Amino acid sequence: MEGIEWNRQNLAYQSLTEVPPELIERDGFKTAELDLTHNKISDLRFLVDYPHLTTLILDHNLVGSHVKMPSMNKLHTLWLNHNKITNLSTFVATLVKSCPNLRHLSMMNNEAAPSFFNGGTFQQYMDYRYFVISRLQKLDALDDKIIQENERAEAERIYGRSKPRKKKKKVEQDNNNT
């Protein structure tokens, strides 16, 4: 949007459980980057008031697998390292729905993102990568690594391509009314 000076809102290390409403009201609309590192955030519904967010940093928070997120079509970078994400398929389904244009995702040191550093095997790490790559097809980087074309091909071979869910047709409802 022309004429708006986009800003970066840094609320790191504040022990916040939520973003103060006065800050959302003052800065939400014009914030492109939001850093909430090292807080106690678990609910992301407040992000509805950040419609132009492109980068969100939530490292070291309490974000879980079943987190509620608004639609964030402009978000391209999301860091969620050191959170409480335990169910990969549930969490990734939320990302597919809420963040369709995500290009950079980092989930290191979550139970759902196995790696050598948190006790996972190399095979578990690769399975995690392939699954995420298969579902978030616009992703360019996952954790600390650029996604290679051979990884995309293997992800598609193993998990297939993620297809958008079709909405139920109104036919079922119409049949009930007759």
Name each region found by the language model.
Residues M1-S42, V48, H52-I57, P70, ...:
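Long, contiguous C-terminal flanking segments immediately downstream of a protein's structured core
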